[in-house]
């Protein structure tokens, strides 16, 4: 083993795919500190990859169960933007191919903006179909946020280029003639729902960044329409915009 240079050990470790590989045992016996560091790095990376694969397996349980029942085009549906004081509620619907594997995809609230953008790109590239539904503030005020979120989800499903034969929906039942399951906290339990949530959130965040150009004083590019201190101070100083939800407190007090 000592006949191998540290560079050679590093290159060889990059080829190792399984923890049962005898080369790892050789590395353990190598007295060189640099080799031990390389081994430790490999073990950490492998453990992380293993955990991500286990997470993926757990989060495809609903999809595998639906597939066993004979369903092939399974769409995950979720929304973003129920709580903000301004902006639309946006829904995403995604059909992922059975062979698709996007490791690390999970509840969008646990992912950084950078990671969400990365997953958004992968989903749009690898998905069999992606649909988006948008319901704006005036409709939210007219029919209430719950119904608006449901309407956005229906729009997202109808926007899919492939017609799904089964739906996995985050905590809601949709008025569609398609078999479906409502999954509580679905974006943490189903990869399809997590994909829908990612599409919804990134789409909405981008919309709010565009609105910020029209209404720069509210900080929409940062707060996404939520009631931050900056947003509330601007609301008090300038009043509500056309994208504010007039039935939401405290917006209604400035109307």
Curated annotation (Swiss-Prot):
One Gene Ontology term of the biological-process aspect is: mismatch repair
* Gene Ontology MF terms: manganese ion binding; RNA binding; RNA-DNA hybrid ribonuclease activity
Q: How is the cofactor bound?
A: Manganese or magnesium. Binds 1 divalent metal ion per monomer in the absence of substrate. May bind a second metal ion after substrate binding.
HAMAP family for the chain: RNase_HII_B
Q: Does the keyword Hydrolase apply?
A: yes
Reported EC number(s) for this entry are 3.1.26.4
Cofactor dependence: Mn(2+); Mg(2+)
Name of the protein in question:
Ribonuclease HII
Q: Which family does it belong to?
A: Belongs to the RNase HII family.
Query: Keyword Iron-sulfur on this protein?
Result: no
- Keyword entries, A-Z: Cytoplasm, Endonuclease, Hydrolase, Manganese, Metal-binding, Nuclease
Q: Which organism is it from?
A: Bacillus velezensis (strain DSM 23117 / BGSC 10A6 / LMG 26770 / FZB42)
Which reaction is catalysed here?
Answer: Endonucleolytic cleavage to 5'-phosphomonoester
Q: Where in the cell is it found?
A: Cytoplasm
- Where is each RNase H type-2 domain found? 72-255
**Residues reported in the UniProt entry to bind a divalent metal cation:** 78-79, 170
Query: What is the role of the protein in this entry?
Result: Endonuclease that specifically degrades the RNA of RNA-DNA hybrids.
One GO CC term on file: ribonuclease H2 complex
Assign the protein's first listed, main location to one coarse class.
cytoplasm
């Amino acid at each position: 083993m000592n006949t191998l240079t540290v560079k050679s050990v590093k290159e060889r470790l990059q080829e190792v795919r399984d923890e049962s590989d005898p080369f790892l045992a050789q590395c353990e016996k190598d007295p060189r500190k640099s080799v031990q560091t390389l081994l430790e790095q490999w073990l950490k990376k492998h453990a992380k990859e293993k955990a991500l694969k286990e997470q993926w397996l757990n989060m495809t349980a609903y999809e595998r169960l639906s597939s066993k029942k004979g369903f092939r085009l399974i769409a995950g549906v979720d929304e973003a933007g129920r709580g903000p004081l301004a902006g639309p509620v946006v829904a995403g619907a995604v059909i992922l191919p059975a062979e698709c594997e996007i490791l690390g995809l999970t509840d969008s609230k646990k992912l950084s903006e950078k990671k969400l953008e990365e997953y958004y790109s992968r989903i749009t590239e690898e998905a069999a179909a992606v649909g988006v539904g948008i319901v704006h503030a005036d409709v939210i005020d007219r029919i209430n946020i719950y119904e608006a979120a449901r309407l956005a989800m229906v729009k997202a499903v109808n926007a899919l280029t492939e017609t799904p034969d089964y739906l996995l929906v985050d905590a809601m039942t949709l008025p569609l003639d398609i078999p479906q399951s409502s999954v509580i906290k679905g974006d943490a339990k189903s990869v399809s729902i997590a994909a829908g949530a990612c599409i919804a959130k990134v789409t909405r965040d981008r919309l709010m960044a565009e609105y910020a150009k029209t209404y720069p004083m509210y900080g929409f590019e940062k707060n996404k329409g939520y009631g931050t201190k900056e947003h509330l101070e601007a609301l008090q100083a300038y009043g509500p915009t056309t994208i504010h939800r007039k039935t939401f407190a405290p917006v209604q007090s400035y109307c």
